[in-house]
Structure formats: C-alpha cells, structure tokens
Curated annotation (Swiss-Prot):
UniProt protein name: 3-isopropylmalate dehydratase large subunit
Binding partners and assembly: Heterodimer of LeuC and LeuD.
Catalytic function, reaction form: (2R,3S)-3-isopropylmalate = (2S)-2-isopropylmalate
Enzyme Commission identifier(s): 4.2.1.33
Task performed by this protein: Catalyzes the isomerization between 2-isopropylmalate and 3-isopropylmalate, via the formation of 2-isopropylmaleate.
UniProt keyword Lyase, yes or no: yes
Organism ancestry: Bacteria, Pseudomonadati, Pseudomonadota, Gammaproteobacteria, Enterobacterales
Binding note for cofactor: Binds 1 [4Fe-4S] cluster per subunit.
Transmembrane regions listed in the UniProt entry: none
Disulfide bonds: none
Cofactor: [4Fe-4S] cluster
Family membership noted in the UniProt record: Belongs to the aconitase/IPM isomerase family. LeuC type 1 subfamily.
GO molecular function, one term: 4 iron, 4 sulfur cluster binding
InterPro entries assigned: 3-IsopropMal_deHydase_lsu (IPR004430), Acnase/IPM_dHydase_lsu_aba_1/3 (IPR015931), Acoase/IPM_deHydtase_lsu_aba (IPR001030), Aconitase_4Fe-4S_BS (IPR018136), Aconitase_4Fe-4S_dom (IPR036008), IPM_dehydratase_rel_enz (IPR050067), IPMI_cat (IPR033941)
Amino acid sequence: MGKTLYHKLYNSHIVYEQNNVTSILYIDLHLIHEVTXPQAFNSLRLKNRKIRQPKKTFATMDHNVPTHNRDIKNSEYMAKIQMEELSKNCKDFNIKLYDINHPHQGIVHVLGPEKGMTLPGMVIVCGDSHTSTHGAFGALAFGIGTSEVEHVLATQTLQQNRLKTMNIEITGNINPMVFAKDIILSIIRKLSTSGGIGYVIEFSGSVISQLSMESRMTICNMSIEMGAKSGLIAPDIITYNYLKNKSYSPKNKYWNNAINYWNTLKSDKNAFFDKKISINISNLAPQITWGTKPDQVISIDEPIPNIDSLKMFLNKNQLKNPLLYMGLKPGEYLNNLVVDKVFIGSCTNSRTEDLRAAANIVQNTHVAKNVHAIVVPGSGMVKLQAEEEGLDKIFINAGFEWRLPGCSMCLGMNLDRLKPKERCASTSNRNFEGRQGRDGRTHLVSPAMAAAAAIFGHFVDIRKI
C-alpha cells in the first residue's frame, strides 16, 4: 500500500515511536509570537533550561501590535507587556526576532513563507491555530499550546498521535470573481466546523494545481475551521518558483538537491485515505457568512436558510442565537445588508495578491460615507511590494486607511476593534461572537467582496458590478 503525503512527513520525523500510535516528532521550524510565548519562557527559566535549537526558532510581533503607528506605549497594558516580554525573551535566549520596528515584521503566517523559512517536507509548529497555513507548501504544520511551546523550545521535539487522513479533491472551473476564500468557505459549509476533527486534510485536484501559493495558503489557513489538525497541498513547480531566492531557501547546489527531495512529497497513487471527497466548483458563487460560525455560509445570491432546512443544527433553538446576535432573519438576502466597517487583512487574506484583488474593485471609486474601511498588509514586505505597485495610493484615494502590518481587526487583542452592533465585512477567518470586538458582527468574505462592500456601503454580488 502506498503512503499519503501526511504519512511520509510524519514517518520521516519520528524520533521515538510507541505502539505505532504515539510518536515523538522532530520539529524543523518553530515560530513564536508575543501572545503564547511568555509563560513558556518563564517556565524555562524556573527549570534552568536552555533552548535546544535557537536557530530553528523565529519570532515576530503581530497579534497586539498597533497598526496606526509603532508606538507600543499607546497599546493597552497587557499588549504592551507581552510585546516587551517577547523582546526580552528573544534577547536572553538568542532568538531571531522581527520586532515591531523591523522593516520585515509581519503576521507570523505571512512572514514565515515569504522569508523562505517555510519549506516543503518540514514539520512546523507555532502557538497559533492557523499554523495550518504553512501546509500549502507540503509541510506538516499545526498549532500548539503554550506548554507545548515550552517543550519544543527545550527539546526541539513534540509528542503527536497519528491522525486520520482525508483527501478533498477540488475540480471544475473557477468562475470570474470567485476566489480561494470562496472555495474554502464553501467546503467548510459542506463539511461543517466539526467535519475535519481527527484528520489531516490534503487538498488536491485540477483547481488546486492552478492556484497561486497565496491562494493555497488561504485554503490551508482555514482548514482548521473544519476542525482539522492541519491542511496539506503537495509541492509543485508553483511552490518552487515562489520559494526560489527567498532569504532562507536553499541556494546553489542545495537548491537542486532540495527540488529532488521535494518532488517525492506527494501521496502515492495507491495511497489509502480514511475519507475521500470530490467537490466540483464550476457553479460556485461568491460566499459570505451569515452567522457566528465559519460553516454558516451562503452564496451572495442565496437567502439565509429557513430553520427547518438547516441539517447542521440538532434542533431549531440552536439557530436562534446566531441570528439574534447578527440581527438577521431566516430567508433574508444579504446583498443589500448595510455594513459599518470593512477590514482587509489577517493571515488569511493580507498578501499582495489579496490586495491586488481588492484594489481592482476600488480603483477610481470611493468608500461610502457610512463605512470606515482599513487595509492592513500582512507584513512589511507585502506593504513595500504593494506600495511599489501603487496599491496604497489606490486605496488611500478611495478613502481607505492604509495601515502598518499586524493582525489588526482579525481579533480584539489590539486597538482595531468593532463597537457593539457594528457590522463588518472582513477577510479574516473567524466570525465568532465578539471575535472582532464585544458584540461586533462579522461577515467573512473575500478581499474583492469586502472592497465592494466598502464602496457601495452594503454587500453586493461582485459578479454584477
């Protein structure tokens, strides 16, 4: 029997195995940020332990950083403390830090790939659930808790059980104004937020092979929203072209050796998957969430389902809270729903490709009077590239705020937040209650959909503008 990509990655990193179920895996890359790292470092100090492989650990500030300016003195108390602690810890333990004033600082899941830290064949961990993003490169990447962060720092290993495997084959034609965000939202709707629990999901098919690395990262980024441990896409020529000449990518003869190895990182034709799903997206329309879970999704031209038709809920009462929270009703269409704020950013959709898609919508237009719209590049490198292309001017001239890199309004841990009852068109990954601010209402959409909502002042079907 052949092996899946997941099993090839897992097996090649086993340091110690017990009963063919639980293994200790070697960790190739450990990414850290200011929120989940402080307690781990404090514990190392208490136990008088050193970091096993400091050069395989990289840090950045992203969750708490202010995006208006770089003065952390204006940040809230806990955010300020966490950033100061990360700076001190990285200095004390000799860890490379892309701090708040570094020109390449950015969201950890944007920074890692664009610097070439993320490479095919690796096992990658970070104290952040959206570490699954890096699986787009054919790496086994997953989020870990703070106690596990400490363990990896101390040993460069981590105990992991073997997981089940799922293959989602995506076929068909990608329609105009349909993006990777729409594809993954539609898949989450189909599988639900629990459909991937206990699995590593490998995405494949003719659609995946056409996607850029930025789009593949969007797909893998949100695999966690199905409950999956990680998402995977086998590396190919698109992967290699993206990685070539990156700061940490192999160089010269090592590059050729790497390509030879990376070419083996694909599931064998006779590999067994515990579950296989095939999805044709030829009829897919732009997607939008209507509730408070990422699987509460509809097409922009589709009404919110009636209670009786929602099989994902065990009883009708379970639907009342999200609709009440969002101020919506069953049967309602969202294509004229007024928005208060628009957020284009996050580790899901803050790369140059995402900003181009949004800029293409807003060029020679202006943000509606009722809307406050911000664009937050995912990193300093993304910001620089966008400015070289003139994207910043397109956004600024259209009435958007052009911000500094950071996680920003994806989560209410910094100064960018929704006020109670404010409705936001957001390119982020989670629409939980209070995620973007207390009592804020979040609708997940693609960058193009968010940009259009900013211009019209309400959601629209971007295929018709």
